[in-house]
Amino acid sequence: MRDSVFNCCVSPPHPPGAAAAERRSRSPAPQNHSRFLMFFDFDETLVDECSDDSMVSAAPGGVLPGWLKDTYRPGRYNEYMQRVLAYLSEQGVTPAAIRATVEKLPPCPGIPALMHFLLSQPSRDFEVVCVSDANTVFIETWLQHMGFQPLFLRIFTNPAHFDDNGVLQLRPFHSHECLRCPANMCKAVVVRQYVAQRIRERGGRPYQKVLYMGDGANDFCPSLTLSPGDVAFPRRDFPMHKLIQEMGEAKPGEFKASVVPWKSGEDVVNTLRKILERT
């Protein structure tokens, strides 16, 4: 990785201002006695590909025209994706077809086992949250299809809805000052503020551990908010993992959390079992 993000998100950006982007699952109101708080990314962490990329398969011939691809600008991916979604609608791709495409997204290896493990645990053990640069329609559609939505107490992502013309409309989650993250979301802000909010709601009682599972460079940002005793689960050999390794070589001891790389959700299950045995 040539472009280091070691200094990203060291000062608090603007607070999230998109309350509509936070979706409560069908699970009960938050319990204040869970011992562990676990965050999940969505693309290439829960699902084994980028959900936005899967939309290409819905286009005529399974490809996007060159003129459309040429409109992409670095740091403005969501704006580009909005043009893609408008194009799909113009080509007759319906909301039902988009949802069906999302439902076909395969889970990452071992993710069903990890989700079922967490669902089987008492509420006093794990509070589970999703933080993703995807959107509400994609994430909620997939979680509902797989039967995993009751596990997630909160979903923080870009708001989305189908308008009267059947076009999926996207909005940015929030604004921020992090120069390294996409303009629409800095996950470190979300994690930092959510943890602080929940600790206040718990009467000042912290979690025993905060856990973060992800894969991308934008998952490295929130992992920097973790403390000693917390655990980062980077997908092995993906950008998050490589950036953690890079930091370890350039600034030994700077990354505070324990690091457990994963290839399968089963790797995470094994670590969670050990944590439960020790606490």
Curated annotation (Swiss-Prot):
Its cofactor is Mg(2+). It is found in: Extracellular vesicle. Substrate binds at D52, D133. One of its GO terms (cellular component) is extracellular membrane-bounded organelle. GO terms for biological process: bone mineralization; regulation of bone mineralization. Its EC number is 3.1.3.75. It is an enzyme of class 3 (hydrolase). InterPro entries: HAD-like_sf, HAD_hydro_PyrdxlP_Pase-like, HAD_sf, Pase_PHOSPHO-typ. GO terms for molecular function: metal ion binding; phosphatase activity; phosphocholine phosphatase activity; phosphoethanolamine phosphatase activity. Mg(2+) binds at D41, D43, D215. It holds the Pfam family Put_Phosphatase. The keyword Magnesium applies. It catalyses: phosphoethanolamine + H2O = ethanolamine + phosphate; phosphocholine + H2O = choline + phosphate. Keywords: Hydrolase, Magnesium, Metal-binding, Mineral balance. The active site is at D41, D43. The keyword Secreted does not apply. NCBIfam families: DKMTPPase-SF, HAD-SF-IB. Belongs to the HAD-like hydrolase superfamily. PHOSPHO family. Phosphatase that has a high activity toward phosphoethanolamine (PEA) and phosphocholine (PCho). Involved in the generation of inorganic phosphate for bone mineralization. This is Probable phosphatase phospho1. It comes from Danio rerio (Zebrafish). The gene is phospho1.
